[in-house]
């Protein structure tokens, strides 16, 4: 490792030399865990020996006492990446934002075990030159100095991401080892004593992205093992460790700025979920509880917060941060269970320090420890360091999206390999990591207490309802209901029903009254008939009959009158019958029977009759003659009376055959081939017709009227129809022959 070079040329030379050493060490070393939270465990536990970065990491691992999974980091593809990282680091000589990321990546790359460590180491070399260039650029005196020192430290320490550059300390591999051991011890002591101290925001912020207190406890319990594992998985975990550690250091060093900057970084990084920033002491507490749960996610968020915090003073760093955040996002799903366990163990403050230092130590051990020291000494400079450390991890995952350009190529390859491995190994952890930072950020409060956001929302909804009700009551406001129209509608409906039923009742009452009246009249007329037969004087009976209202509509009235007249002597029976029909007497058939009996009475001729003409007429008159006379009177009668009069003789004739209401229908014979003589003949078919329909048929349309000719008797048939030959056709529904002989079929 080369001593810190303030100028860009010196930084470039140191970076190149570091790159060569790192590549040589990388050939021996295997990729460390890209998951920073796993790095803290695995790297600290078992760090595969490396030329420069591995030694301080091993020392840090010894200090942290986390020997667990050194093999994962080895399995990760870090060796092929050193050249890629070197190439990526060279183009990544960019403004302070790249520098911040490079610092992080350099610190991470300092640990050859992890891919991010190699990349970060290369980035540190490139970062040194870029730091010099950035120091030249007006990014801020503090930021330029921090970047320069970070470049030097990264070049010297490899694993010292930005802590040494904050102090402008160049530490070689041995110095990194010693410094990492010391810093790990110091950080462990600081974390054990004061896990919420601001100088340790790196660790706390790292644990914070881990998100869950129980995970933090696990981290505290397994930090040494996680460090050992992280040394094995240094390549895989280095990025995450760097991200987490850098995020922790940044958040701890600048609690307020980290929150504000995290907002800016989150806004600048649409892919990255914005984490809620809280003061450093709150971040520490949250990092303790939450880092163990979901270290990767919180590391991302912390990195975002730290980037945003430090990117505001150093806008160039902010640019580099979005890349690191993206990378961190990619690395989150790649978190290893060992790293998660290590971060779970971080719940204990002492173990948190070990774990954080170890996580950073595997790829970034010395750098992170130095960063923690530098942060405790110089919080402003630690901001730059943290910014630089943060981009290293994200640069590994985004694969040169927007972080350290120098490390983009190598980190992209590493990130790809790590992404595939981590996705396979820890898909659930990635999901938890993604979700964890949100929950942690939501759980974090100003008082540093953790609460469940879901419970808060439920409580707030209920409280809001209650408050709304109370407020409405206090203001005297009530919801106005529309006027109840149903009652009025119901009333209207009831009235309508009442009127309807009343009308029906009235009709029924009227009918009942009519029936009662008709029954009374019938009873009275029946008594009169009995009196006439009993020999009561006719004058008294006539007085009674004249006193009965509407008696003319009853046939019994006319029967009584006919009997009274017959008892006195001869009278015009047919005239009486015609008058009864005009008045609409019913039932007319009873009157007809009486009239026929009077006419047929032979005793009547023996009695004294003054007029010979009347005697001859009565003796010769028959029912058919009466019918003809009634037809002559039809012109004087109303339609109803006319129908009744016309029906009288027909019914009388039908009565001869005992088939009342039957008429004759004349219809044409269908044409038959070979029988032309049949065409002159017509069918006569007996049919039954309703008198009610006959009365109303005149009002029917033509389609409903009778199409064929219908006659009441044969005499009428001869008058109407000119056809001389008729064929009687039997009606199956009416088995009546009417005296015709049915042809045998």
Curated annotation (Swiss-Prot):
Residues 25-141, 192-217, 256-276, 385-411 are annotated as: Disordered. Residues 30-61, 121-133, 389-411 have a biased composition (Polar residues). Residues 109-120 have a biased composition (Low complexity). Signal peptide: none annotated. The keyword rRNA processing does not apply. Its main location: cytoplasm. The modification Phosphothreonine is found at residue 742. There is a cross-link at residue 198 (Glycyl lysine isopeptide (Lys-Gly) (interchain with G-Cter in SUMO2)). Ubiquitinated by the anaphase promoting complex/cyclosome (APC/C). A motif (KEN box) lies at residues 185-187. It is found in: Cytoplasm, Cytoskeleton, Spindle pole. Residues 192-203 have a biased composition (Basic and acidic residues). There is a cross-link at residue 198 (Glycyl lysine isopeptide (Lys-Gly) (interchain with G-Cter in SUMO1)). One of its GO terms (cellular component) is microtubule cytoskeleton. The modification Phosphoserine is found at residue 745. It holds the Pfam family CKAP2_C. Induction: Expression is cell-cycle dependent. Undetectable in interphase and prophase, strong expression at the spindle pole throughout metaphase to telophase. The modification Phosphotyrosine is found at residue 204. Changing residue 198 to R: Abrogates sumoylation. Belongs to the CKAP2 family. It is linked to Filippi syndrome: A rare disorder characterized by microcephaly, pre- and postnatal growth failure, syndactyly, and distinctive facial features, including a broad nasal bridge and underdeveloped alae nasi. Some affected individuals have intellectual disability, seizures, undescended testicles in males, and teeth and hair abnormalities. PANTHER family: CYTOSKELETON-ASSOCIATED PROTEIN 2-LIKE (PTHR47078:SF1). Microtubule-associated protein required for mitotic spindle formation and cell-cycle progression in neural progenitor cells. This is Cytoskeleton-associated protein 2-like. The lineage of its organism: Eukaryota, Metazoa, Chordata, Craniata, Vertebrata.
